[in-house]
Protein backbone atom coordinates (compact mmCIF):
# COMPACT_ATOMS: atom_id res chain seq x y z
CA UNK A 1 0.00 0.00 0.00
CA UNK A 2 1.34 3.44 -0.93
CA UNK A 3 2.31 5.89 1.79
CA UNK A 4 -0.46 8.31 0.82
CA UNK A 5 -2.95 5.60 1.80
CA UNK A 6 -1.18 4.05 4.79
CA UNK A 7 -0.09 7.25 6.54
CA UNK A 8 -2.90 8.46 8.88
CA UNK A 9 -2.40 12.11 7.88
CA UNK A 10 -1.77 11.67 4.18
CA UNK A 11 -4.68 9.24 3.91
CA UNK A 12 -7.01 12.04 5.00
CA UNK A 13 -5.64 14.30 2.27
CA UNK A 14 -5.79 11.40 -0.19
CA UNK A 15 -9.44 10.71 0.60
CA UNK A 16 -10.38 14.33 -0.17
CA UNK A 17 -8.08 15.23 -3.08
CA UNK A 18 -7.15 12.03 -4.93
CA UNK A 19 -9.49 9.13 -4.22
CA UNK A 20 -12.51 11.21 -3.31
CA UNK A 21 -15.67 9.48 -4.62
CA UNK A 22 -17.62 11.79 -6.88
CA UNK A 23 -20.75 11.31 -8.99
CA UNK A 24 -20.05 10.22 -12.56
CA UNK A 25 -22.24 13.09 -13.79
CA UNK A 26 -19.57 15.67 -12.81
CA UNK A 27 -17.33 17.07 -15.55
CA UNK A 28 -14.47 19.55 -16.02
CA UNK A 29 -16.76 22.53 -15.42
CA UNK A 30 -16.53 21.71 -11.71
CA UNK A 31 -12.82 22.68 -11.78
CA UNK A 32 -13.70 26.37 -12.15
CA UNK A 33 -14.59 26.66 -8.46
CA UNK A 34 -11.16 25.42 -7.36
CA UNK A 35 -9.51 27.79 -9.88
CA UNK A 36 -11.41 30.64 -8.22
CA UNK A 37 -9.90 29.60 -4.91
CA UNK A 38 -6.42 29.57 -6.47
CA UNK A 39 -6.95 33.06 -7.95
CA UNK A 40 -8.15 34.33 -4.59
CA UNK A 41 -5.02 33.07 -2.83
CA UNK A 42 -2.83 34.69 -5.52
CA UNK A 43 -4.66 38.01 -5.14
CA UNK A 44 -4.35 37.97 -1.36
CA UNK A 45 -0.64 37.12 -1.45
CA UNK A 46 0.33 39.65 -4.15
CA UNK A 47 -1.97 42.33 -2.69
CA UNK A 48 -0.40 41.95 0.74
CA UNK A 49 3.12 42.58 -0.66
CA UNK A 50 1.89 45.54 -2.75
CA UNK A 51 0.20 47.10 0.30
CA UNK A 52 3.57 47.13 2.09
CA UNK A 53 4.85 49.75 -0.41
CA UNK A 54 1.61 51.65 -1.11
CA UNK A 55 0.79 55.08 0.32
CA UNK A 56 -2.90 55.90 0.69
CA UNK A 57 -2.38 59.62 0.17
CA UNK A 58 -3.72 61.74 -2.69
CA UNK A 59 -0.27 63.24 -3.33
CA UNK A 60 1.78 60.05 -3.00
CA UNK A 61 -0.54 57.31 -4.29
CA UNK A 62 0.60 57.40 -7.95
CA UNK A 63 4.25 57.90 -6.98
CA UNK A 64 4.13 54.91 -4.62
CA UNK A 65 2.89 52.72 -7.49
CA UNK A 66 5.76 53.93 -9.68
CA UNK A 67 8.11 53.23 -6.78
CA UNK A 68 6.92 49.62 -6.75
CA UNK A 69 7.51 49.27 -10.49
CA UNK A 70 11.01 50.84 -10.48
CA UNK A 71 12.65 50.44 -7.07
CA UNK A 72 11.10 47.46 -5.29
CA UNK A 73 12.75 44.11 -5.97
CA UNK A 74 10.33 42.11 -8.22
CA UNK A 75 7.69 44.77 -7.54
CA UNK A 76 6.74 44.86 -11.21
CA UNK A 77 6.09 41.11 -11.05
CA UNK A 78 3.88 41.45 -7.98
CA UNK A 79 1.86 44.23 -9.62
CA UNK A 80 1.37 42.33 -12.90
CA UNK A 81 0.43 39.16 -11.01
CA UNK A 82 -2.13 41.17 -9.07
CA UNK A 83 -3.52 42.96 -12.16
CA UNK A 84 -3.69 39.89 -14.41
CA UNK A 85 -4.82 37.71 -11.51
CA UNK A 86 -7.83 40.01 -11.14
CA UNK A 87 -8.68 39.50 -14.82
CA UNK A 88 -8.38 35.72 -14.51
CA UNK A 89 -10.36 35.86 -11.28
CA UNK A 90 -13.31 37.47 -13.05
CA UNK A 91 -12.97 35.16 -16.05
CA UNK A 92 -13.25 32.14 -13.75
CA UNK A 93 -16.04 33.86 -11.86
CA UNK A 94 -18.16 34.34 -15.00
CA UNK A 95 -17.42 30.77 -16.15
CA UNK A 96 -18.49 29.52 -12.73
CA UNK A 97 -21.73 31.51 -12.92
CA UNK A 98 -22.35 30.36 -16.49
CA UNK A 99 -21.97 26.73 -15.44
CA UNK A 100 -24.40 27.26 -12.58
CA UNK A 101 -26.95 28.93 -14.88
CA UNK A 102 -26.63 26.13 -17.45
CA UNK A 103 -27.15 23.37 -14.89
CA UNK A 104 -29.93 25.19 -13.03
CA UNK A 105 -28.09 25.63 -9.73
CA UNK A 106 -30.25 28.66 -8.94
CA UNK A 107 -33.36 26.50 -8.65
CA UNK A 108 -34.80 25.00 -5.50
CA UNK A 109 -33.42 23.57 -3.27
CA UNK A 110 -30.10 25.39 -3.94
CA UNK A 111 -31.52 28.92 -3.68
CA UNK A 112 -29.55 29.70 -0.51
CA UNK A 113 -26.23 28.63 -2.05
CA UNK A 114 -26.96 30.66 -5.19
CA UNK A 115 -27.92 33.74 -3.14
CA UNK A 116 -24.64 33.55 -1.22
CA UNK A 117 -22.76 33.41 -4.53
CA UNK A 118 -24.59 36.46 -5.88
CA UNK A 119 -23.76 38.42 -2.72
CA UNK A 120 -20.10 37.46 -3.05
CA UNK A 121 -20.15 38.53 -6.72
CA UNK A 122 -21.53 41.98 -5.84
CA UNK A 123 -18.93 42.47 -3.09
CA UNK A 124 -16.16 41.33 -5.45
CA UNK A 125 -17.20 43.93 -8.05
CA UNK A 126 -17.22 46.66 -5.41
CA UNK A 127 -13.77 45.58 -4.19
CA UNK A 128 -12.40 45.58 -7.76
CA UNK A 129 -13.72 49.12 -8.40
CA UNK A 130 -12.11 50.42 -5.22
CA UNK A 131 -8.80 48.76 -6.11
CA UNK A 132 -8.99 50.31 -9.59
CA UNK A 133 -9.20 53.77 -8.04
CA UNK A 134 -6.27 53.30 -5.64
CA UNK A 135 -3.60 54.10 -8.27
CA UNK A 136 -5.11 57.59 -8.55
CA UNK A 137 -3.97 58.19 -12.11
CA UNK A 138 -5.86 59.20 -15.26
CA UNK A 139 -7.51 55.82 -15.67
CA UNK A 140 -8.50 55.80 -12.01
CA UNK A 141 -10.02 59.27 -12.37
CA UNK A 142 -12.04 58.45 -15.49
CA UNK A 143 -13.08 55.12 -14.05
CA UNK A 144 -14.48 56.92 -11.03
CA UNK A 145 -16.16 59.46 -13.34
CA UNK A 146 -17.91 56.70 -15.29
CA UNK A 147 -19.17 55.12 -12.11
CA UNK A 148 -20.28 58.52 -10.83
CA UNK A 149 -22.24 59.14 -14.05
CA UNK A 150 -24.27 56.03 -13.32
CA UNK A 151 -26.33 58.38 -11.17
CA UNK A 152 -27.86 59.73 -14.39
CA UNK A 153 -29.76 56.46 -14.70
CA UNK A 154 -31.89 57.48 -11.74
CA UNK A 155 -35.25 58.91 -12.91
CA UNK A 156 -36.12 62.57 -12.33
CA UNK A 157 -33.24 63.52 -10.00
CA UNK A 158 -30.35 61.73 -11.76
CA UNK A 159 -29.53 64.55 -14.18
CA UNK A 160 -29.22 67.08 -11.36
CA UNK A 161 -27.05 64.80 -9.25
CA UNK A 162 -24.38 64.25 -11.94
CA UNK A 163 -22.93 67.86 -12.01
CA UNK A 164 -22.86 67.94 -8.24
CA UNK A 165 -21.13 64.58 -8.13
CA UNK A 166 -18.50 65.70 -10.70
CA UNK A 167 -17.71 68.83 -8.64
CA UNK A 168 -17.34 66.74 -5.54
CA UNK A 169 -15.59 63.82 -7.26
CA UNK A 170 -12.02 64.95 -6.49
CA UNK A 171 -12.91 65.71 -2.90
CA UNK A 172 -14.72 62.41 -2.54
CA UNK A 173 -11.78 60.51 -4.02
CA UNK A 174 -9.41 62.26 -1.66
CA UNK A 175 -11.59 61.50 1.35
CA UNK A 176 -12.25 57.95 0.27
CA UNK A 177 -8.72 56.95 -0.78
CA UNK A 178 -7.72 55.79 2.68
CA UNK A 179 -11.18 54.35 3.22
CA UNK A 180 -10.85 52.35 -0.01
CA UNK A 181 -7.54 50.96 1.18
CA UNK A 182 -9.05 49.85 4.49
CA UNK A 183 -12.11 48.35 2.81
CA UNK A 184 -10.01 46.41 0.31
CA UNK A 185 -8.01 44.90 3.15
CA UNK A 186 -11.21 44.06 5.02
CA UNK A 187 -12.81 42.59 1.91
CA UNK A 188 -9.66 40.63 1.10
CA UNK A 189 -9.67 38.90 4.46
CA UNK A 190 -13.46 38.62 4.63
CA UNK A 191 -13.63 37.01 1.20
CA UNK A 192 -12.15 33.69 2.37
CA UNK A 193 -14.61 33.74 5.26
CA UNK A 194 -17.51 34.30 2.86
CA UNK A 195 -16.05 31.60 0.64
CA UNK A 196 -15.93 29.18 3.54
CA UNK A 197 -19.53 29.98 4.47
CA UNK A 198 -20.57 29.25 0.89
CA UNK A 199 -18.46 26.08 0.92
CA UNK A 200 -20.10 24.88 4.13
CA UNK A 201 -23.56 25.55 2.70
CA UNK A 202 -22.63 23.84 -0.56
CA UNK A 203 -21.13 20.79 1.12
CA UNK A 204 -24.00 20.56 3.60
CA UNK A 205 -26.43 20.54 0.70
CA UNK A 206 -24.39 17.89 -1.15
CA UNK A 207 -24.13 15.65 1.92
CA UNK A 208 -27.86 16.00 2.51
CA UNK A 209 -28.56 15.20 -1.13
CA UNK A 210 -26.27 12.16 -1.18
CA UNK A 211 -27.77 10.90 2.09
CA UNK A 212 -31.24 11.36 0.61
CA UNK A 213 -30.23 9.43 -2.52
CA UNK A 214 -28.64 6.65 -0.45
CA UNK A 215 -31.65 6.28 1.83
CA UNK A 216 -33.98 6.41 -1.15
CA UNK A 217 -32.02 3.60 -2.74
CA UNK A 218 -32.86 1.45 0.28
CA UNK A 219 -36.56 2.18 0.05
CA UNK A 220 -37.41 3.12 -3.52
CA UNK A 221 -36.56 1.64 -6.92
CA UNK A 222 -36.69 5.16 -8.41
CA UNK A 223 -33.14 5.82 -7.27
CA UNK A 224 -30.25 3.37 -7.21
CA UNK A 225 -26.77 3.95 -5.93
CA UNK A 226 -24.15 1.28 -6.47
CA UNK A 227 -22.65 0.85 -3.00
CA UNK A 228 -20.85 -2.42 -3.61
CA UNK A 229 -17.44 -0.68 -3.70
CA UNK A 230 -17.91 1.78 -0.83
CA UNK A 231 -19.61 4.32 -3.08
CA UNK A 232 -16.50 4.66 -5.27
CA UNK A 233 -18.72 4.65 -8.32
CA UNK A 234 -21.89 6.52 -7.55
CA UNK A 235 -24.59 6.08 -10.17
CA UNK A 236 -27.96 7.69 -10.24
CA UNK A 237 -30.25 5.46 -12.25
CA UNK A 238 -33.13 7.87 -12.57
CA UNK A 239 -34.31 9.95 -15.45
CA UNK A 240 -37.26 11.45 -13.62
CA UNK A 241 -36.79 14.31 -11.23
CA UNK A 242 -39.25 16.29 -9.16
CA UNK A 243 -38.75 19.92 -8.26
CA UNK A 244 -40.42 19.35 -4.92
CA UNK A 245 -39.52 16.48 -2.64
CA UNK A 246 -42.40 14.51 -1.20
CA UNK A 247 -43.09 14.64 2.48
CA UNK A 248 -41.96 11.15 3.44
CA UNK A 249 -41.94 11.19 7.21
CA UNK A 250 -44.10 12.22 10.15
CA UNK A 251 -42.88 14.80 12.59
CA UNK A 252 -42.73 13.58 16.16
CA UNK A 253 -45.51 15.97 17.15
CA UNK A 254 -47.76 14.58 14.39
CA UNK A 255 -47.32 11.07 15.78
CA UNK A 256 -47.96 12.14 19.36
CA UNK A 257 -50.98 14.29 18.48
CA UNK A 258 -52.68 11.53 16.50
CA UNK A 259 -56.08 10.57 17.96
CA UNK A 260 -55.41 7.06 19.27
CA UNK A 261 -59.06 5.99 19.16
CA UNK A 262 -59.48 7.15 15.57
CA UNK A 263 -56.21 5.43 14.64
CA UNK A 264 -57.47 2.14 16.11
CA UNK A 265 -60.68 2.50 14.08
CA UNK A 266 -58.70 3.06 10.89
CA UNK A 267 -56.45 0.07 11.64
CA UNK A 268 -59.53 -2.11 12.05
CA UNK A 269 -60.94 -0.73 8.81
CA UNK A 270 -57.69 -1.55 6.99
CA UNK A 271 -57.66 -4.98 8.63
CA UNK A 272 -60.99 -5.73 7.02
CA UNK A 273 -60.91 -4.07 3.61
CA UNK A 274 -57.22 -3.42 3.00
CA UNK A 275 -54.35 -5.61 1.91
CA UNK A 276 -50.60 -5.07 1.79
CA UNK A 277 -49.39 -6.05 -1.64
CA UNK A 278 -45.81 -7.06 -2.27
CA UNK A 279 -44.34 -7.85 -5.67
CA UNK A 280 -41.20 -7.26 -7.66
CA UNK A 281 -40.58 -4.32 -9.92
CA UNK A 282 -37.92 -4.71 -12.59
CA UNK A 283 -35.72 -1.79 -13.53
CA UNK A 284 -32.21 -1.65 -14.99
CA UNK A 285 -32.05 -5.48 -14.94
CA UNK A 286 -32.68 -5.48 -11.18
CA UNK A 287 -35.75 -6.82 -9.34
CA UNK A 288 -36.72 -4.40 -6.59
CA UNK A 289 -39.20 -4.95 -3.77
CA UNK A 290 -42.39 -2.98 -4.31
CA UNK A 291 -44.95 -2.72 -1.51
CA UNK A 292 -48.23 -0.87 -1.16
CA UNK A 293 -51.33 -0.90 1.01
CA UNK A 294 -54.52 -0.80 -1.06
CA UNK A 295 -58.17 -0.41 -0.12
CA UNK A 296 -60.87 -0.79 -2.77
CA UNK A 297 -64.36 0.29 -1.72
CA UNK A 298 -67.63 1.18 -3.33
CA UNK A 299 -67.57 4.56 -5.08
CA UNK A 300 -70.05 5.86 -2.47
CA UNK A 301 -67.30 5.51 0.17
CA UNK A 302 -65.01 7.99 -1.59
CA UNK A 303 -65.65 10.71 1.02
CA UNK A 304 -64.87 8.28 3.83
CA UNK A 305 -61.51 7.42 2.28
CA UNK A 306 -60.80 11.11 1.74
CA UNK A 307 -61.52 11.74 5.43
CA UNK A 308 -59.08 9.00 6.50
CA UNK A 309 -56.52 10.30 4.02
CA UNK A 310 -56.87 13.78 5.51
CA UNK A 311 -56.28 12.43 9.03
CA UNK A 312 -53.21 10.34 8.17
CA UNK A 313 -51.84 12.32 5.21
CA UNK A 314 -50.72 9.09 3.56
CA UNK A 315 -51.00 7.88 0.00
CA UNK A 316 -53.61 9.05 -2.46
CA UNK A 317 -57.36 8.57 -2.93
CA UNK A 318 -58.92 8.36 -6.37
CA UNK A 319 -61.72 6.80 -8.40
CA UNK A 320 -60.89 3.84 -10.58
CA UNK A 321 -62.89 1.78 -13.08
CA UNK A 322 -61.77 -1.85 -13.40
CA UNK A 323 -62.12 -3.74 -16.65
CA UNK A 324 -64.98 -5.68 -15.14
CA UNK A 325 -67.34 -4.39 -12.49
CA UNK A 326 -68.50 -1.07 -11.12
CA UNK A 327 -66.56 2.07 -10.37
CA UNK A 328 -64.47 1.87 -7.20
CA UNK A 329 -62.90 4.31 -4.74
CA UNK A 330 -59.28 3.41 -4.00
CA UNK A 331 -56.90 4.45 -1.25
CA UNK A 332 -53.32 3.50 -2.08
CA UNK A 333 -50.20 3.98 0.05
CA UNK A 334 -46.78 3.33 -1.46
CA UNK A 335 -43.64 1.92 0.11
CA UNK A 336 -42.42 5.27 1.43
CA UNK A 337 -45.77 5.93 3.13
CA UNK A 338 -45.67 2.53 4.82
CA UNK A 339 -42.03 2.75 5.90
CA UNK A 340 -41.84 6.38 6.98
CA UNK A 341 -45.36 7.06 8.24
CA UNK A 342 -47.51 4.02 8.92
CA UNK A 343 -44.91 1.85 10.67
CA UNK A 344 -43.58 4.61 13.02
CA UNK A 345 -47.16 5.62 13.83
CA UNK A 346 -48.26 2.09 14.78
CA UNK A 347 -45.05 1.44 16.72
CA UNK A 348 -45.41 4.63 18.77
CA UNK A 349 -49.04 3.83 19.69
CA UNK A 350 -48.21 0.12 20.18
CA UNK A 351 -50.86 -1.10 17.73
CA UNK A 352 -50.96 -4.12 15.46
CA UNK A 353 -53.16 -5.52 12.77
CA UNK A 354 -55.20 -8.37 14.26
CA UNK A 355 -56.35 -10.50 11.34
CA UNK A 356 -53.94 -13.33 10.60
CA UNK A 357 -53.34 -12.38 6.96
CA UNK A 358 -52.77 -8.69 7.66
CA UNK A 359 -50.46 -9.49 10.59
CA UNK A 360 -48.20 -11.59 8.37
CA UNK A 361 -48.16 -8.93 5.66
CA UNK A 362 -47.30 -6.18 8.15
CA UNK A 363 -44.58 -8.23 9.89
CA UNK A 364 -43.01 -8.94 6.50
CA UNK A 365 -43.03 -5.18 5.85
CA UNK A 366 -41.31 -4.56 9.21
CA UNK A 367 -38.66 -7.18 8.50
CA UNK A 368 -37.92 -5.69 5.08
CA UNK A 369 -37.63 -2.19 6.53
CA UNK A 370 -35.46 -2.95 9.56
CA UNK A 371 -33.15 -5.30 7.65
CA UNK A 372 -32.94 -2.86 4.72
CA UNK A 373 -33.85 -5.38 2.05
CA UNK A 374 -33.93 -3.78 -1.40
CA UNK A 375 -33.97 -6.56 -3.94
CA UNK A 376 -36.68 -9.17 -4.37
CA UNK A 377 -34.06 -11.94 -4.24
CA UNK A 378 -33.23 -10.85 -0.66
CA UNK A 379 -36.65 -12.10 0.46
CA UNK A 380 -36.00 -15.53 -1.02
CA UNK A 381 -32.53 -15.69 0.55
CA UNK A 382 -33.91 -14.69 3.98
CA UNK A 383 -37.05 -16.81 3.82
CA UNK A 384 -36.23 -18.90 6.92
CA UNK A 385 -35.44 -15.83 9.02
CA UNK A 386 -38.60 -14.09 7.81
CA UNK A 387 -40.79 -17.07 8.76
CA UNK A 388 -39.17 -17.21 12.19
CA UNK A 389 -39.66 -13.47 12.70
CA UNK A 390 -43.34 -13.67 11.72
CA UNK A 391 -43.94 -16.71 13.91
CA UNK A 392 -42.36 -15.08 16.98
CA UNK A 393 -44.27 -11.81 16.61
CA UNK A 394 -47.74 -12.95 15.52
CA UNK A 395 -50.47 -12.19 18.05
CA UNK A 396 -52.74 -15.25 18.24
CA UNK A 397 -55.00 -14.78 21.27
CA UNK A 398 -56.13 -12.43 24.05
CA UNK A 399 -57.29 -9.84 21.53
CA UNK A 400 -60.00 -8.54 23.86
CA UNK A 401 -57.36 -7.53 26.45
CA UNK A 402 -55.88 -5.00 24.05
CA UNK A 403 -56.71 -1.43 25.10
CA UNK A 404 -57.58 -0.47 21.52
CA UNK A 405 -59.68 -3.54 20.68
CA UNK A 406 -63.06 -1.76 21.07
CA UNK A 407 -62.28 0.94 18.52
CA UNK A 408 -60.52 -1.58 16.29
CA UNK A 409 -63.73 -3.63 16.28
CA UNK A 410 -65.77 -0.57 15.22
CA UNK A 411 -63.45 -0.09 12.26
CA UNK A 412 -63.51 -3.81 11.43
CA UNK A 413 -67.32 -3.70 11.51
CA UNK A 414 -67.27 -0.81 9.03
CA UNK A 415 -65.33 -3.07 6.68
CA UNK A 416 -66.73 -6.57 7.26
CA UNK A 417 -69.89 -6.10 9.33
CA UNK A 418 -73.50 -6.15 8.14
CA UNK A 419 -76.64 -4.86 9.86
CA UNK A 420 -79.19 -7.11 8.18
CA UNK A 421 -82.95 -6.63 7.95
CA UNK A 422 -84.82 -9.68 6.70
CA UNK A 423 -88.03 -9.65 4.71
CA UNK A 424 -90.09 -10.54 7.78
CA UNK A 425 -88.50 -7.54 9.58
CA UNK A 426 -86.31 -9.77 11.70
CA UNK A 427 -82.86 -8.33 12.25
CA UNK A 428 -79.40 -9.73 12.81
CA UNK A 429 -75.79 -8.63 12.97
CA UNK A 430 -73.10 -10.39 10.98
CA UNK A 431 -69.30 -10.32 10.71
CA UNK A 432 -67.61 -12.41 8.07
CA UNK A 433 -64.00 -13.02 7.02
CA UNK A 434 -61.59 -15.78 6.08
CA UNK A 435 -58.86 -17.58 8.10
CA UNK A 436 -59.39 -15.88 11.48
CA UNK A 437 -60.81 -18.52 13.83
CA UNK A 438 -59.04 -17.29 16.98
CA UNK A 439 -60.06 -13.68 16.35
CA UNK A 440 -63.72 -14.61 15.89
CA UNK A 441 -63.64 -16.77 19.03
CA UNK A 442 -62.48 -13.68 20.91
CA UNK A 443 -65.42 -11.73 19.46
CA UNK A 444 -67.79 -14.39 20.78
CA UNK A 445 -66.31 -13.94 24.26
CA UNK A 446 -66.33 -10.16 23.93
CA UNK A 447 -70.06 -9.97 23.12
CA UNK A 448 -70.86 -12.72 25.63
CA UNK A 449 -72.96 -14.71 23.19
CA UNK A 450 -73.65 -18.43 23.04
CA UNK A 451 -73.95 -18.51 19.28
CA UNK A 452 -71.42 -20.72 17.58
CA UNK A 453 -69.32 -19.63 14.65
CA UNK A 454 -70.32 -20.78 11.20
CA UNK A 455 -67.45 -22.05 9.07
CA UNK A 456 -68.22 -22.88 5.45
CA UNK A 457 -66.22 -25.06 3.07
CA UNK A 458 -64.15 -22.07 1.91
CA UNK A 459 -63.00 -21.48 5.52
CA UNK A 460 -65.01 -18.27 5.86
CA UNK A 461 -65.72 -17.47 9.52
CA UNK A 462 -69.16 -16.02 10.17
CA UNK A 463 -70.16 -14.40 13.43
CA UNK A 464 -73.95 -14.09 13.35
CA UNK A 465 -76.28 -13.01 16.18
CA UNK A 466 -80.03 -12.48 16.10
CA UNK A 467 -81.39 -13.07 19.62
CA UNK A 468 -82.80 -10.12 21.55
CA UNK A 469 -80.08 -10.30 24.18
CA UNK A 470 -77.34 -10.32 21.56
CA UNK A 471 -78.98 -7.48 19.62
CA UNK A 472 -79.11 -5.41 22.81
CA UNK A 473 -75.41 -6.08 23.36
CA UNK A 474 -74.72 -4.82 19.85
CA UNK A 475 -76.74 -1.65 20.44
CA UNK A 476 -74.95 -1.05 23.74
CA UNK A 477 -71.59 -1.46 22.05
CA UNK A 478 -72.23 0.80 19.07
CA UNK A 479 -74.45 3.45 20.75
CA UNK A 480 -73.93 3.51 24.52
CA UNK A 481 -70.17 3.07 24.87
CA UNK A 482 -67.37 5.60 24.57
CA UNK A 483 -66.06 4.07 21.37
CA UNK A 484 -65.52 5.87 18.10
CA UNK A 485 -68.83 6.08 16.19
CA UNK A 486 -69.46 4.30 12.91
CA UNK A 487 -68.76 6.34 9.79
CA UNK A 488 -69.78 6.40 6.15
CA UNK A 489 -72.32 4.04 4.60
CA UNK A 490 -72.11 1.67 7.58
CA UNK A 491 -73.51 4.44 9.80
CA UNK A 492 -76.46 4.83 7.40
CA UNK A 493 -77.08 1.06 7.51
CA UNK A 494 -76.89 1.09 11.30
CA UNK A 495 -79.44 3.94 11.55
CA UNK A 496 -81.85 2.04 9.29
CA UNK A 497 -81.31 -1.02 11.44
CA UNK A 498 -82.12 0.96 14.61
CA UNK A 499 -85.17 2.52 12.98
CA UNK A 500 -86.51 -0.95 12.17
CA UNK A 501 -85.97 -2.04 15.77
CA UNK A 502 -87.82 1.02 17.11
CA UNK A 503 -90.83 0.33 14.89
CA UNK A 504 -90.99 -3.41 15.50
CA UNK A 505 -93.29 -4.86 18.15
CA UNK A 506 -90.95 -7.80 18.58
CA UNK A 507 -88.06 -5.62 19.75
CA UNK A 508 -90.04 -2.93 21.58
CA UNK A 509 -88.49 -3.79 24.97
CA UNK A 510 -84.96 -3.18 23.66
CA UNK A 511 -83.24 0.00 24.74
CA UNK A 512 -82.30 2.11 21.71
CA UNK A 513 -80.70 5.56 21.38
CA UNK A 514 -82.69 8.65 20.49
CA UNK A 515 -82.78 9.22 16.74
CA UNK A 516 -83.07 12.66 15.17
CA UNK A 517 -85.32 13.28 12.19
CA UNK A 518 -82.20 13.39 10.00
CA UNK A 519 -81.17 9.90 11.14
CA UNK A 520 -84.68 8.63 10.47
CA UNK A 521 -84.61 10.10 6.98
CA UNK A 522 -81.40 8.20 6.33
Curated annotation (Swiss-Prot):
InterPro entries: Cyt_b/b6_N, Cytb/b6-like_sf, Cytochrome_b_N_euk/bac, Di-haem_cyt_TM, Homing_endonucl, LAGLIDADG_dom. GO terms for biological process: mitochondrial electron transport, ubiquinol to cytochrome c; mRNA processing; RNA splicing. CDD domains: Cytochrome_b_N. PROSITE patterns: CYTB_NTER (PS51002). Residues 53-84, 132-154 are mitochondrial intermembrane. It comes from the Eukaryota. Keywords: Membrane, Mitochondrion, Mitochondrion inner membrane, mRNA processing, mRNA splicing, RNA-binding, Transmembrane, Transmembrane helix. Disulfide bonds: none annotated. It is a multi-pass membrane protein. Residues 1-31, 106-110, 176-522 are mitochondrial matrix. Residues 164-522 are annotated as: Maturase. It holds the Pfam family Cytochrome_B. Residues 1-163 are annotated as: Cytochrome b. The chain crosses the membrane at residues 32-52, 85-105, 111-131, 155-175. It is found in: Mitochondrion inner membrane. GO terms for cellular component: mitochondrial inner membrane. The keyword Aminoacyl-tRNA synthetase does not apply. Its main location: mitochondrion. In the N-terminal section; belongs to the cytochrome b family. Mitochondrial mRNA maturase required for splicing of intron 3 of the cytochrome b (COB) gene, containing its own coding sequence. Encoded from partially processed COB mRNA that terminates with the in-frame coding sequence of the third intron. This is Cytochrome b mRNA maturase bI3. It comes from Debaryomyces hansenii (strain ATCC 36239 / CBS 767 / BCRC 21394 / JCM 1990 / NBRC 0083 / IGC 2968) (Yeast).
